[in-house]
Every structure is written in C-alpha cells, then in structure tokens.
Design a protein with these regions (language model features):
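Structural/interface elements that position substrates and couple domains in central-metabolism enzymes
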Residues: 4, 22, 70, 74-75, ...
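Catalytic core of non-heme Fe(II) oxygenases with the double-stranded beta-helix
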Residues: 80-139, 145-152, 157-168
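Short helix-terminating capping/connector loops at secondary-structure junctions
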Residues: 35, 70, 146-147
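Conserved double-stranded beta-helix
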Residues: 40-43, 47, 53-111
C-alpha cells in the first residue's frame, strides 16, 4: 500500500475534545498499567464509554484513507508518564491496517516517528498512517519527571480482515 502520512487538524469538535480529555484525565489511574511501555491503557471494548468518541470518526477515516468500506476495529486510550514511558520501533500486528493517532494532552510534546519521518502533534491533532505496514515509534520520553502524554489510537480495517472473520482469519 502506498500512503503518505497525513496530519489531521481538529480531529474532534472543541467541546467534544474537551470532554474527552477531561474524562481521560480523571479515569486513567483506574486502567491497567503496562510497565514495559510506562503507560496506563484501556481499549474501547473494556471501556465502552470511549466508543462515544471514536464511533463518529469512521467517516473521517474513510475520507482520509480513501476507502468507502473500511470499518472501525478497536481503539485504545493510553496515558504515558515517568521514566519507563516508551514506544519502541514496531509495525502493528493486530487489527490496525489504518491508524489514526490523536494527541489528547501533553505537557511536553513527544514526537511520533513513521518510516523515519518525525511528527510533532499538537492537542487535537491526529496522524493517519498504515499501522500494520509502516514502522513507527517514539524516541526518549521528554521530561519524564513532570510530563504526561495522553494518546488515542483509533484503528480501522477492511471488512474482509481477519478481525471480522474475513479472508485473513
């Protein structure tokens, strides 16, 4: 697949975005903590309230990725903090063909690298890329003593993807 990553401004309307950030900041300590990534995280199957915010993004994703058939697979909210916060180089191996990473909040920006290109996202900006095909990572977590970074990972796949029991099952 040939796709040029795209930065998307104002992923959410301002009032919706502010509500999402407020809910995530209040709730993150209730979610599982993954020591290997230095993050609290939860998916939208376990925290169904997240679906209120991610479901409306389907139309935007279809437009960005130029596919009228893609479907939402799952989303994850992640809150990174401390010395262990990291995201090593990887390609996704789950139902992440189309990925929209949205910056919810940050005290110090933490850039995202995709295929060797660095992206600094502002709050309510997203980066669209092919999560399963494009290597992506983050470098050292900036200001680990004070920094907190909230990210929303929204993933989409085609209907014949194994996630939906399709040809790749």
């Amino acid at each position: 697949m040939v796709f040029q990553e795209k930065v998307i401004d104002k992923v959410f309307p301002e009032t919706v975005f502010n509500q999402l950030v407020s809910v995530c900041k209040r709730q993150y300590k209730r979610f599982p903590y993954a020591e290997e990534f230095g993050r609290y995280f939860i998916n939208d199957k376990e925290w169904t309230a997240l679906q209120i915010y991610t479901s409306p993004l389907l139309g935007l994703a279809r437009e960005i990725f130029d596919s009228t058939t893609l479907e939402h697979s799952y989303s994850i909210f992640a809150h990174y903090e401390g010395n262990q916060a990291q995201l090593p180089k990887h390609k996704d191996n789950n139902a992440c063909t189309y990925t929209l990473d949205v910056c919810l909040y940050q005290q110090t920006p933490w850039s995202l690298w995709v295929e060797g290109k660095e992206y600094f996202l502002e709050e309510n900006q997203g980066l669209a890329f092919y999560g399963e095909d494009q290597e992506h990572w983050r470098e050292n977590f900036p200001n680990p003593v004070n920094n907190q970074v909230g990210q929303l990972f929204v993933h989409f796949v085609e209907p014949d993807h194994w996630f939906f029991g399709g040809k790749d099952a």
